[in-house]
């Protein structure tokens, strides 16, 4: 998401039930504003795991503020019903901040971070750990994000460079 904007902007936040019940404000949550640029050594990974093990997962995500880039202002993101998880976070951040046009179909609405365990017969139970909320207050779990420009498609017409959503995205970029 940091590549979409030159500025440091709040992206969204996760909030656990415990933090929500306490009435904590998003502004008071710990901030994650930079991802490591180098792969840490195994000892650093172990140290980080021990530091954050059992910690409340509530955190604010903030873009890194990487400065101006050539592509800023001319970005189109293509979505469909399989766009989920971090893909929905990127789309929501871009849409809320006017950083890109979203073209295609509504996203999946599957965004809650969770952890799971096996229950046998090849099944897993996944339990939510926290809710994800965009900085503007929107939650997508169970209902996806509508694109700026809805483009109908079918599996037969979606393959290849002339798929309707890609054609629409190209038109937007060329105009």
PLM features: residue spans?
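C-terminal "post-core" interaction segments
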Residues: 1-175
């Amino acid at each position: 998401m940091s590549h979409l904007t030159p500025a440091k902007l709040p992206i969204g936040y996760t909030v656990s039930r415990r933090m929500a019940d306490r009435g904590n404000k998003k502004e008071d949550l710990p901030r994650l504003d930079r991802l490591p640029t180098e792969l840490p050594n195994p000892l650093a990974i172990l140290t980080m795991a021990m530091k954050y093990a059992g910690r409340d997962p509530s955190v604010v995500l903030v873009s890194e503020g990487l400065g101006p880039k050539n592509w800023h202002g001319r970005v189109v993101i293509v979505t469909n019903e399989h766009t989920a998880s971090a893909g929905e976070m990127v789309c929501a951040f871009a849409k809320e901040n006017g950083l890109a046009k979203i073209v295609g179909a509504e996203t999946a609405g599957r965004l809650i971070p969770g952890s799971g365990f096996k229950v046998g017969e090849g099944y897993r139970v996944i339990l939510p750990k926290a809710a994800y909320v965009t900085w503007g207050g929107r939650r997508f779990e169970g209902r996806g994000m509508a694109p700026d420009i809805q483009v109908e498609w079918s599996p037969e017409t979606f393959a290849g460079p002339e798929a309707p959503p890609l054609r629409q995205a190209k038109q937007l970029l060329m105009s």
